[in-house]
Amino acid sequence: MGILDPYKGFGVTFGTMFKKPTTEQYPEEKKETAPRFHGRHQLNRHPDGLEKCVGCELCAWACPADAIYVEGADNTEAERYSPGERYGRVYQINYLRCILCGLCIEACPTRALTMSNDYELADDSRQDLIFTKEQLLAPLREGMEAPPHPMRLGSSETDYYTRDPDAPLPWQASGQEQVAGQAAELEAADVIARRTAGEHSRADEVPAHGAGSERPR
């Protein structure tokens, strides 16, 4: 042993004395997770409240830990839970088996299943770690209606997946849009009434080559 070896050991000790502690004061202070963190699963809804899950069971087939159980059923006109022909009547995830790998998310064809940032899954009951459909479903937001109910975003399943996601919903038109629509309807009705009465003004004419343009000479 060299004469400097003890000082080298103390150097490591003294160096750690000035480092900031890495201990998190959990659960009082929870660490913020990454945006794409693999946490508890969530079953998503369409903007009208219908479920995105169509009961195809692809997530269960893709699960390497056999942690997902799905039982599908047919929709009817009297009871509709999703826009498709079928919906997930029973949906369970066993978090005693789940390894949070995310393969079920990749297999889902309708983006019905996603992973949240909730990582607090510890429990002292094995039965409570088997999450049911009611526990996994996303909460109802403004404008949503709890199923079963008819389709409100279109007349077919295709309308739900081809609509512009940024477009306003049919029942969520803003006050300005409603006022503008009413003003346009009144203006159109006024023009029709004046034309019916035989009145005609320059303002009622529509230029052949666009508003404000002149006919080329």
Curated annotation (Swiss-Prot):
GO terms for biological process: aerobic respiration. It comes from the Bacteria. Its cofactor is [4Fe-4S] cluster. [4Fe-4S] cluster 1 binds at residues 53, 56, 59, 108. It is a peripheral membrane protein. Its main location: membrane. Pfam families: Fer4_7. Residues 22-41, 193-217 are annotated as: Disordered. Residues 43-73, 89-118 form the 4Fe-4S ferredoxin-type domain. The keyword Transcription does not apply. [4Fe-4S] cluster 2 binds at residues 63, 98, 101, 104. One of its GO terms (cellular component) is plasma membrane. Its EC number is 7.1.1.-. It is an enzyme of class 7 (translocase). It catalyses: a quinone + NADH + 5 H(+)(in) = a quinol + NAD(+) + 4 H(+)(out). One of its GO terms (molecular function) is 4 iron, 4 sulfur cluster binding. It is found in: Cell membrane. HAMAP family: NDH1_NuoI. NDH-1 shuttles electrons from NADH, via FMN and iron-sulfur (Fe-S) centers, to quinones in the respiratory chain. The immediate electron acceptor for the enzyme in this species is believed to be ubiquinone. Couples the redox reaction to proton translocation (for every two electrons transferred, four hydrogen ions are translocated across the cytoplasmic membrane), and thus conserves the redox energy in a proton gradient. Belongs to the complex I 23 kDa subunit family. This is NADH-quinone oxidoreductase subunit I. It comes from Frankia casuarinae (strain DSM 45818 / CECT 9043 / HFP020203 / CcI3). The lineage of its organism: Bacteria, Bacillati, Actinomycetota, Actinomycetes, Frankiales. The gene is nuoI.
